[in-house]
Curated annotation (Swiss-Prot):
SMART domains, per the entry: DNaseIc
Record site feature (Nitration by tetranitromethane destroys a Ca(2+) binding site and inactivates enzyme), residues: Y87
Protein name, as recorded: Deoxyribonuclease-1
Disulfide bridge partners, by residue number: C123-C126, C195-C231
Primary gene name: Dnase1
Catalytic residues identified in the record: E100, H156
Cited InterPro entries: Deoxyribonuclease-1_AS (IPR018057), DNase_I (IPR016202), DNASE_I_2 (IPR033125), Endo/exonu/phosph_ase_sf (IPR036691), Endo/exonuclease/phosphatase (IPR005135)
Site annotation Involved in actin-binding: residues: E35, V89
GO CC, alphabetical: extracellular region; nuclear envelope; zymogen granule
Amino acid sequence: MRYTGLMGTLLTLVNLLQLAGTLRIAAFNIRTFGETKMSNATLSVYFVKILSRYDIAVIQEVRDSHLVAVGKLLDELNRDKPDTYRYVVSEPLGRKSYKEQYLFVYRPDQVSILDSYQYDDGCEPCGNDTFSREPAIVKFFSPYTEVQEFAIVPLHAAPTEAVSEIDALYDVYLDVWQKWGLEDIMFMGDFNAGCSYVTSSQWSSIRLRTSPIFQWLIPDSADTTVTSTHCAYDRIVVAGALLQAAVVPNSAVPFDFQAEYGLSNQLAEAISDHYPVEVTLRKI
């Protein structure tokens, strides 16, 4: 028994050391995240529990133009230790009255923000813009990872325009490269990249998929939905030799918080209809 206990302790220490030696990044579509959800004590506990797993988390479907819910979320994330997390948030995005924001929360002791910008996808009033919610792009610096500078490009694609919007991320890649001279770019979010929104015959028309520049880390067979559907809507795609080499093999997965925390269907779906998708990067 003593031997078994010692081995268990050693395995735990090894796991902790492995975790400490990585940077964990996630994208999480929290369905209709705003004041109502954040005011629910039960839901807020799970938002904090889930997001605390990550060094960087990109939250989509944020509907909080006055940042009341965002402020409460950061207060809870920083409750035990001030300045554990900081945030940067996009302007409200959308073609009509319905707007969403992209929210990045990150640990300042692990990464810092070097720059950011809103991708210009054309004239919205003219009707020739590309995205329903154009990406808000952030360049991070981490002194501890094998790749020290990298950009994250989030996308919450409109379901009926998923094919064209995912394809247009190739143009975003070129724009980031031209602006910053940076090839190490991570695209992540709810692409609606599966089931009826992107069929098997449509992948050949998506440059982000057909170009050898990009590695798709979440496979088509994955299920990133909380409900009874089985769809790989949420994805992580990486470009750049340094970033691709820094990815820990097999670390890109959906995080099934329902199974992890033993939640009922009702509670899990109240949190969101999507699981986060996550990936880890090696530290030096």
